[in-house]
Amino acid sequence: MIERYLRELEAELGAVGIRGPQRRRILAETADHLRETGDVARFGESKLIAARFADELATNGARRVAYTSFLALAPAGIAYAILLGLIRTGPDITSGKVLPLAIASALTVVLAPQVAFATGLLTVARAWRLRSETAVPAAEIGVLRRRAAVALGSGAAAFTGIAVYAYEYSSGLPSWWTTTAFAVSGAVLVPIAGAAVALARNARVRPQASGPAGDLFDDVAPLLDLVPFRLRGRPWRFCLLVAVAVAAAALIAGGPDEGPRNAVFEFVAVCAGFAGLGRFLGLRR
C-alpha cells in the first residue's frame, strides 16, 4: 500500500513540475512518515498533496527569485550610471559603423534601464507584499515571475546595448571608455544570468491554487494612500501622473535645448509601456 502511494505521489509531483532532488526529498520524507504511522488514507490524496507542495515551492521560490533579481540588478544600475556619467560629450548619433544597429543600441541604452528599474521595483513590491504567505494563487506567482523576467531581460538588454554602443561609436568615444564598457558589461551580465537560471528553475514548478492575481494598487497600497489624487482603482490616472513626473525630470535634466524633446519622448514611452505591458505585468486588471 505504501509503495503504491509513493509511486502515485511521484507521478503527481512530476505532473506539477517537481522533479530531481526536490522530488526525491519529498518522497523520502513521505515514506518515513507513512512507515511511522502506517495510515496512508489519512495522509491525503496524492494529487492534492502534490498540488500543495507545488503551491508552497512555487511561492517561496518565486519570492526568492524576486529578491535575487533585484540584488543582481542593483549593482548593474550603479555601473550603468557611472559608465554614462564618464562620457563628457556623446558621439554624433550618425557616426555609427552600421547606422541602424547603432541607433537601435542607443535607444536600448536609454529605454532598457528604465524598464529594468521600474519592473525590478515592482517585482520587489509584489514579493514584499507576499512575504508572510506560505502559498498564493498561481496567478499571483505568474505575475511575480513575469515581472522578474522582464526586469532581468531588460537589464541584460541594457548592457548588451552598451557593449554594442561602445563598438558602433568607438571612433567618437575614448578608447579607455570602450574597453571599460566591454569589461563592465560582461561582468554585470554574469549575476543577471545567474538570476535568470534561478527563475527558469522556479518556472518549472506549476502551482495549482486558484485566485486573483491582484494589481499594482494591491502592491503599493500604503504609498498610494499618501497621495491625494484618488489613484486606487484608476490605473490610467496613475500612469499619466507617473508619465508627467518622468517627463518633468527629463525636461529639467535636458535643459532648454534637449529638454522638451526628451520630455515628450519619455511621456510617450511611459504611456506606451503601460499600455503594452500593463496587463502582462499585473499593473492593471
Predicted regions and their residues:
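Negatively charged linear elements and acidic catalytic determinants
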Residues: 1-71
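Hydrophobic alpha-helical bundles in membrane proteins
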Residues: 60-285
